[in-house]
Amino acid sequence: MAVSTNELAILAIVLLVTAVVFYTKGTRRAPLPPGPRGIPFLGNLFQFNVMRPYPQYLKWAQKYGPVFSIKLGSQRIIVLSTSEAADELFVTRSKLYSSHESPHVGFDLVSDQQRMVFMPYSREWKIVRKNVHGILGPGPSKQMRKMQDLECRIMLHDLLCHGDTSIVEDFVEGPHGKVPERHWFSIIRRYTTSLMMTLVYGRRIHRIVDNPELHQVYEMMSNMTHVSQPGRYLVDALPILRWLPDIMAPWRAEGKRMHEWEMGFWGKLFADSRTAFLNGTGLNGFVQSYLSARAEAGLEDLPGKGATEDGAGWMRDKLITYTAVSIIEAGSDTTSTAVFSFVLLMLSNPDALRRAKEEMGAVVGSSRMPDWEDEDRLPWLTACIKETLRCAPPLPLGIPHKADEDDVYNGYLIPKGSTVIGNIWAIHMDPVRYPDPTAFKPERFYNPDGKLNWASGPDTHNRDHYIFGWGRRFCSGKYLAEASMFIVLSRLIWGFDFYAASDPQTGKVKLPDVNDVDTFTDGLVTAPKIYPVGFKPRSEKHAEMIKASYRDVQNDWQSMGLAGDER
């Protein structure tokens, strides 16, 4: 049958229209979550403080709902402000959301793509996670309790000797929030850092004053919380800028310089540890154990970064170095920050503090120090710790996740490549979940008759708080952190009457306002800025026990082959 030219033209038009309709229907996408209107190209970049976004995110959640979206340049950010939304995406749909956002400067440049916390969900991340879980998991972390006990006893002695030094000397923070080495914050930091350094490298932090090693660790951690904050660098919001030449990309030189700074410290620690291992003089720790196992597999020398491609997936030297960093960071910052917030909140709520002391006196008394076996018998103290973590989460927005595929949630599109944030601050300030959310009310978690349930428990929907994240990226150091928080804070309540500074003219107590965001530092991790506190032993008997315990621990260090304390 012959077909005319007109018929061919009509057929072509019909086919074209059909194809267009089919294509349009097949690719019609759900709408994005609502959010504030931005400006062309830059989006919402200049509408809030990118170094302290959580107060504005809470306001936007109240206006636009539990799931809203913003843009920082070309970077789409989806913010989840209810536990239901975060649980659904990060736990139930974890296959799509187990990657973390990898900031260009913080991950690619400063960390040379080796820092676990910012790795995508990949084979390399699984290798690192397996090794980290092997020493920080629920079983292995309990093996650290002796070290936690001993280091905590040193901490108590340091606070006893410190007395009212922080009040009398009225210290001021140094550049970039640097803590003076004689401030009481440094005593707490020594505890957490020494614990983690012993776990990883088999060496203690046995001195506070004139010890640049201790303070550089926290300078580097503080630096990382700033450079990895979404929106901190324009290149993270506009990835096309990565193609600029060096002369037009100052962040590139800055990132490389910071990497050299980190490797000058962490890289030297690893190199010294490896040399000691090769010489047969190595100390017991994660790095030594891993190098030994790797050598037994015939891979004594394995420079470079990443892991081997074989089934064993042995970590190369730089990946071991940054895995050690990840372990130290996981166990140091959260714990010390929680202690600073706990002391501030308890001093701001004297009735809660009085009740904690009364409970401690009734359960433990003055003839011994509290231990982990007392935890279930100290429900008010545990409730105070949980309420501290709710009111002052160390990571108000957690670690940002990334959508590995397009997804639809509650009718809203979450495009592939979007940064997806679990808004811990908004969840913790939800008046439905926590009535009167800005008030410090430990009774929310007070359960004198039941088994205490920490955030590391299996029930993701009824957790007390969300500071350890969600799903497959749940914080590896959670078990060690919870154990440290309990032993440090229980013994602090047991051993001391701690008190704030007073105004010499009015006699009124001077304390930072816990509900003022300016009380806390900026960045991915937020901690109280330094404030003065004095420490007085609750009795002469408590003081003598602390002194005797300090002397006994020096013998323990000697028998364990670890450095004794220098004060």
UniProtKB/Swiss-Prot annotation:
> Which pathway does this chain act in?
Secondary metabolite biosynthesis
Pull one GO CC term from this UniProt entry: membrane
GO MF terms, alphabetically ordered: heme binding; iron ion binding; monooxygenase activity; oxidoreductase activity, acting on paired donors, with incorporation or reduction of molecular oxygen
**Bilayer-crossing regions:** 7-24
> What keywords does the record list, in alphabetical order?
Glycoprotein, Heme, Iron, Membrane, Metal-binding, Monooxygenase, Oxidoreductase, Transmembrane, Transmembrane helix
Q: How does it sit in the membrane?
A: Single-pass membrane protein
- Residues where heme binds: C475
List required co-factors: heme
Q: What residues bear carbohydrate chains?
A: N223, N279
Question: Where, per UniProt, does this protein localize?
Answer: Membrane
Its biological purpose is as follows: Cytochrome P450 monooxygenase that is able to use dehydroabietic acid as a substrate for oxidation.
Q: Which family does it belong to?
A: Belongs to the cytochrome P450 family.
Task: From the Swiss-Prot or TrEMBL record, give the protein name.
Answer: Cytochrome P450 monooxygenase 79
Tell me the classification of the organism that encodes this protein: Eukaryota, Fungi, Dikarya, Basidiomycota, Agaricomycotina
Q: Which gene produces this protein? A: CYP079
